[in-house]
Amino acid sequence: MPVARSWVCRKTYVTPRRPFEKSRLDQELKLIGEYGLRNKREVWRVKFTLAKIRKAARELLTLDEKDPRRLFEGNALLRRLVRIGVLDEGKMKLDYILGLKIEDFLERRLQTQVFKLGLAKSIHHARVLIRQRHIRVRKQVVNIPSFIVRLDSQKHIDFSLRSPYGGGRPGRVKRKNAKKGQGGAGAGDDEEED
């Protein structure tokens, strides 16, 4: 007998109020092209995350500066944003959170970082490499293009050890050509002996 499961989940994005606003459509399309996103939902998801962070910062700014909640939660929020590389260490104030843009978060995606490091020929190639499990962060293979790369993990992005790009087993075509090369050389020797 099947067991009924209740999934606890919430929406990770909010659709725009005005569906056909030309300026917004153009801006979203530009972001999709620049950062190699799959669809508008990926833009909306980042926008939603940014909105939640800014809302938290605005709420904390309404409290008194010496308020323990503002000190504790404000520092936690700032540290988190600095750790993922969205905010500079010199700008560790709540006011700077309100000035963050979507591009700041899109720059920290694994897909963008792989392209910027020169591991991929284009932003779209970076997405393919990640999905095909060729990229690792530290020792962990990551196959999610939207993975947010922390500042300390940025220098540890590299090809997977099992990937043909990273010195692992050669790919299908390379193996086929190598086999053909060995077989061709062996066949040529036999003909000369006869």
From Swiss-Prot:
GO CC, alphabetical: cytoplasm; cytosol; cytosolic ribosome; cytosolic small ribosomal subunit; extracellular exosome; focal adhesion; membrane; nucleolus
Locations listed in the record: Cytoplasm; Nucleus, Nucleolus
Stretch list, region Disordered: 162-194
Residues recorded with modification N6-acetyllysine: 66, 116, 155
Superkingdom of this protein's organism: Eukaryota
Chain residue numbers at which the record places covalent cross-link Glycyl lysine isopeptide (Lys-Gly) (interchain with G-Cter in SUMO2): 93, 139
InterPro entries: Ribosomal_uS4, Ribosomal_uS4_CS, Ribosomal_uS4_euk/arc, Ribosomal_uS4_N, S4_RNA-bd, S4_RNA-bd_sf
Domain annotation S4 RNA-binding: ranges: 108-182
Keywords: Acetylation, Cytoplasm, Isopeptide bond, Nucleus, Phosphoprotein, Ribonucleoprotein, Ribosomal protein, RNA-binding, rRNA-binding, Ubl conjugation
Chief site of localization: cytoplasm
Record GO biological process: cytoplasmic translation; positive regulation of cell population proliferation; ribosomal small subunit biogenesis; translation
Sequence positions bearing Phosphoserine: 153, 163
Matching Pfam families: Ribosomal_S4, S4
One function term, GO molecular function aspect: structural constituent of ribosome
Record-stated family: Belongs to the universal ribosomal protein uS4 family.
Subunit structure: Component of the small ribosomal subunit. Identified in a IGF2BP1-dependent mRNP granule complex containing untranslated mRNAs. Part of the small subunit (SSU) processome, composed of more than 70 proteins and the RNA chaperone small nucleolar RNA (snoRNA) U3.
Physiological role: Component of the small ribosomal subunit. The ribosome is a large ribonucleoprotein complex responsible for the synthesis of proteins in the cell. Part of the small subunit (SSU) processome, first precursor of the small eukaryotic ribosomal subunit. During the assembly of the SSU processome in the nucleolus, many ribosome biogenesis factors, an RNA chaperone and ribosomal proteins associate with the nascent pre-rRNA and work in concert to generate RNA folding, modifications, rearrangements and cleavage as well as targeted degradation of pre-ribosomal RNA by the RNA exosome.
PANTHER family noted in UniProt: 30S 40S RIBOSOMAL PROTEIN (PTHR11831), SMALL RIBOSOMAL SUBUNIT PROTEIN US4 (PTHR11831:SF46)
Protein name stated in the entry: Small ribosomal subunit protein uS4
Species this chain originates from: Homo sapiens
Lineage of source species: Eukaryota, Metazoa, Chordata, Craniata, Vertebrata
Name of the gene this protein is made from: RPS9
